[in-house]
């Protein structure tokens, strides 16, 4: 299902696929390039009506936005060590429902690269099939303890949400448009109305020593993103916003 940049998923987008014999629905809960956070209740209801196996890529929204796998009837959730876990990339995390585990264990498909059946069997003895990135696993362990000590999952979602709200309130008056119709807490996607998005990214990086997120392809000059996950504070946003205002004063934006 292809949507225009920044557009939310709606019932009319799903209607043509109703009752068409599909067996699974794969969705990235948050489309990171344009900052669109998809309506998982809409998708869940569609999958339940059509008896679809629901696989959700939560990599950029995990711990940033609410997600109740059981309530939504999701069968597989995928995330990673980067993004809101704020660890180096290198560990993929998959959570399987009982239905998904049963499906894996009963599949006749021969896997040559990534066999979840082997992973599940090794999990019974607390192991992985092959040596994982042990250093990153230890970092994830420490990070989860930190999250647990600071209000748990709900506390982390609230913290990230508060940072997103703070930033979005503070940029009012700058020549930027928020392009997403359905925002995630994880990131704010901005379209500069007076300058190239990529030129702004370079200027902020080279002259102010700060990194915002550029885009590629046909969005290179139209959209950049500012993240709200990881070890960020309101002081970081104050510095970035001051840089934006300085660029406006200099008529760069």
Listing of model-derived features with the role each one plays in the protein:
Residues 9-63:
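Active-site phosphate-binding strand-loop segment of PLP-dependent enzymes
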Residues 70-82:
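Conserved active-site segment immediately N-terminal to the catalytic lysine
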Residues 176-207:
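Conserved PLP-binding catalytic core of the aspartate aminotransferase-like
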Residues 218, 222-253:
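PLP-dependent enzyme catalytic core of the Aspartate aminotransferase-like
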């Amino acid at each position: 299902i292809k949507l225009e940049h920044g557009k939310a998923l709606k019932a009319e987008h799903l209607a043509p696929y109703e009752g068409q014999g599909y067996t699974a629905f794969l969705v990235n809960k948050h489309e990171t390039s344009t900052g669109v956070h998809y309506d998982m209740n809409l998708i869940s209801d569609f999958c339940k009506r059509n008896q679809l196996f629901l696989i959700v890529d939560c990599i950029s929204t995990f711990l940033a936005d609410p997600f109740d796998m059981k309530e939504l009837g999701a069968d597989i959730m995928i995330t990673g060590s980067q993004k809101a876990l704020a660890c180096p990339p290198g560990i993929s995390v998959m959570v399987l429902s009982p239905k998904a585990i049963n499906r894996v264990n009963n599949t006749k498909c021969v896997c040559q690269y990534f066999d979840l059946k082997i992973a599940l069997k090794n999990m019974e003895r607390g192991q992985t099939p092959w040596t994982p990135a042990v250093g990153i696993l230890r970092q994830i362990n420490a990070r989860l303890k930190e999250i647990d000590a600071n209000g748990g999952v709900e506390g982390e979602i609230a913290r990230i949400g508060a940072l997103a709200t703070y930033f979005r309130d503070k940029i009012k008056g700058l020549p930027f448009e928020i392009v997403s119709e359905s925002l995630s807490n994880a990131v704010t996607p901005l379209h500069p109305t007076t300058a190239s998005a990529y030129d702004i990214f370079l200027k902020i990086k080279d002259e102010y020593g700060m990194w915002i997120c550029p885009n590629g392809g046909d969005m290179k000059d139209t959209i950049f993103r500012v993240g709200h996950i990881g070890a960020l504070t309101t002081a970081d946003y104050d510095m970035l916003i001051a840089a934006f205002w300085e660029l406006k004063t200099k008529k760069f934006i």
